[in-house]
Amino acid sequence: MSTTQAPKRYSPLWVTLHWIIALLIFAAFYLGLSTKDIPLVEKVGILRWHMPLGITVLLLMIVRFVVRWRTPHPEPATAGNALLDKIGEWTHYLIYVFAILMPLTGLVLSATFNLAPVVFGGEGALPRDLSPMLHGLIDPILALLILLHILAALYHQFIRKDNLLARMWYGK
């Protein structure tokens, strides 16, 4: 019986998806936060970019799940501590959940308030404040999870010196 060994790094497709999704999420965060405390007319222009970014993140996250199921990937990194390893595992799961919930709640928000004709067609008016909606409440949770993910990667790279970042980059 032969067993296959897990690869040392993620596939180029996986790496590409990771970094594109990360950039899109940061851009969507920036644009979403830019809509706070500005006139409604200016919000429409920002939402013209923010909404398609969110939909793109959702679609790429679906592709990412398919790639995850169909391609071999490295074993989870270890922090040398069972509790930290479990926190890392759950942080990854929760990032996936919230990275999908964020655009889904954005779509629900858009459908509920019929935002597409307002944002893309210039017909109608935006509601005064959308931030208390579920979409706005998920925002800080996802941001905190991403911050935790980044700090953990830096911990591995510079304190544990296990070259973890090489797993999520191109190379042999």
Where are the model-predicted features located?
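Membrane-embedded alpha-helical bundles that constitute the cytochrome b-like, heme-associated redox core
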Residues: M1-K172
